[in-house]
From Swiss-Prot:
Keywords, ordered alphabetically: Metal-binding, Methyltransferase, rRNA processing, S-adenosyl-L-methionine, Transferase, Zinc
Name the record gives this protein: 23S rRNA (guanine(748)-N(1))-methyltransferase
Catalytic activity: guanosine(748) in 23S rRNA + S-adenosyl-L-methionine = N(1)-methylguanosine(748) in 23S rRNA + S-adenosyl-L-homocysteine + H(+)
Organism, scientific name: Streptomyces fradiae (Streptomyces roseoflavus)
S-adenosyl-L-methionine keyword on record: yes
Pfam families: Methyltransf_25, Zn_ribbon_RlmA
Residues reported to bind Zn(2+): 11, 14, 27, 31
Consequence when changing residue 82 to G: In strain: ATCC 19609
EC number: 2.1.1.188
Record lineage: Bacteria, Bacillati, Actinomycetota, Actinomycetes, Kitasatosporales
SS bond partners: none
Length: 280
């Protein structure tokens, strides 16, 4: 956990500012949080029963992202973040539900002085994210709960294929800050719904996003990316294993279905990037 990031944090129990002392974060009311040797810190306010990504899911996602298959998405995200920031480069970028830190690391390359903080409920993901970039820090946090950040701490927030809590994101963003949300389109990975039992993207996802954000944010821009991925059998397995569909899959049956597909299978990547500003 970088000391430059600690100044943006607050205690999840009492909301007092957190300070760094040796390998411990503490607030004035005596709440303490040890920094793990891998560099992340657990800032959960209370235990959660929500399912977080497992070690296997995180490993599959890391392998797929590192392979470059999702590079069109990551590069478009970085470019959109750069354009949204304009002349005022952010000093603090928060990735909410950011997983392994792959996307945050690329965005940080656009802003040479920015500090990055990734929040996720998955400890295996946060552990990886702590070393995703020299200016990235990470913490275990429930993104549905009160976020462990001070009011107006962040200049930019990322939310890529992840849950979001609009009132809390609004609170932690400064006036004039940027929220960048990436959501799947109806045809995203559609070729794998029947072939491999992938969960289907729900109808009217964009409309629900707009309704969810409306009381707290104004959408000021939107871009779409649609491209074709050419995935081998290993990559197909990782696509399934890294997401919620993996909870419902029998590994042997999945392997059998993948083996029946062509050696290189064309799959649609289709997403929307929505740029938002907090409402007064």
């Amino acid at each position: 956990m970088r000391k430059n990031v600690v100044r943006y944090l607050r205690c999840p129990h009492c909301a007092a500012p957190l300070r760094s002392s040796d390998r411990t974060l503490r607030c004035e009311n005596g709440h303490t949080f040890d920094v793990a040797r891998q560099g992340y810190v657990n800032l959960l306010r209370r235990p959660t029963k929500l399912a977080a990504d497992t070690t296997d899911m995180v490993a599959a996602r890391a392998a797929l992202l590192d392979s470059g298959h999702y590079a069109p998405l990551t590069e478009r995200l970085a470019g959109t973040a750069r354009r949204a920031a304009g002349a005022g480069a952010p000093d603090c970028v928060v990735d909410i539900g950011g997983g392994t830190g792959h996307h945050l690391a690329r965005v940080l390359e656009e802003f040479e002085d920015a500090e990055g903080l990734l929040l996720d409920m998955s400890k295996p993901a946060v552990r990886r994210a702590a070393r995703a970039h020299p200016r990235a820090s990470s913490a275990v946090a429930d993104v549905w709960d009160t976020l462990p950040l001070r009011d107006g701490a962040a200049a930019m927030a990322l939310n890529v294929f992840a849950p979001r809590n609009p009132p809390e994101i609004r609170r932690i963003l400064r006036p004039g800050g940027t929220l960048l949300v990436v959501t799947p389109q109806q045809d995203h990975l559609a070729e794998l719904v029947d072939a491999l039992g992938l969960l289907r993207v729900r109808d009217h996802k964009e409309g629900r996003l707009a309704e969810q954000l409306a009381p707290h944010f104004e959408a000021v821009g939107q871009e779409r990316l649609r491209t074709t991925l050419r995935l081998d059998h290993d990559a197909l397995g990782r696509v399934v294993a890294m997401g919620p569909s993996s909870w419902h899959q029998d590994p042997d049956e999945l392997a059998r279905r993948i083996a029946e597909l062509p050696g290189i299978h064309e799959v649609t990547l289709s997403v929307t990037f929505t740029v938002c500003r907090p409402l007064p």
